[in-house]
């Protein structure tokens, strides 16, 4: 198994996530999707090293990260839907106007 090719793919996914955050700082949904892409790149690293050293701990961590990421996405999207219903926009520059 050639680990360097897969790590390159994981690094590209992670850098695409960072690039997506810095490129589009106005839309919170794109930022949330970029963060999820970064989490998936980290998951891929856990899985690759788990297979490479023949240990199942990395696979368990990847499963844990997937469940946390799914919960984070669901909560984030639910908050965005409520915020959109109240304000009528989900632009990042208006989110800092929230009080409480």
From Swiss-Prot:
Primary site of residence: mitochondrion
Pfam families: Oxidored_q2 (PF00420)
EC number(s) from the headed UniProt entry: 7.1.1.2
UniProt record, GO biological process: ATP synthesis coupled electron transport
Membrane topology type: Multi-pass membrane protein
Transmembrane segments: 3-23, 28-48, 61-81
Catalytic activity of the protein: a ubiquinone + NADH + 5 H(+)(in) = a ubiquinol + NAD(+) + 4 H(+)(out)
Enzyme class: translocase
Keyword Transport: yes
Molecular function as annotated in GO: NADH dehydrogenase (ubiquinone) activity
Keywords assigned: Electron transport, Membrane, Mitochondrion, NAD, Respiratory chain, Translocase, Transmembrane, Transmembrane helix, Transport, Ubiquinone
Protein origin, superkingdom: Eukaryota
Localization annotation: Mitochondrion membrane
GO cellular component terms attached to this protein's record: mitochondrial membrane; NADH dehydrogenase complex
Summary of subunit composition and partner proteins: Complex I is composed of about 45 different subunits.
Family according to the record: Belongs to the complex I subunit 4L family.
Task performed by this protein: Core subunit of the mitochondrial membrane respiratory chain NADH dehydrogenase (Complex I) that is believed to belong to the minimal assembly required for catalysis. Complex I functions in the transfer of electrons from NADH to the respiratory chain. The immediate electron acceptor for the enzyme is believed to be ubiquinone.
Name by which UniProt lists this protein: NADH-ubiquinone oxidoreductase chain 4L
Organism, as annotated: Prototheca wickerhamii
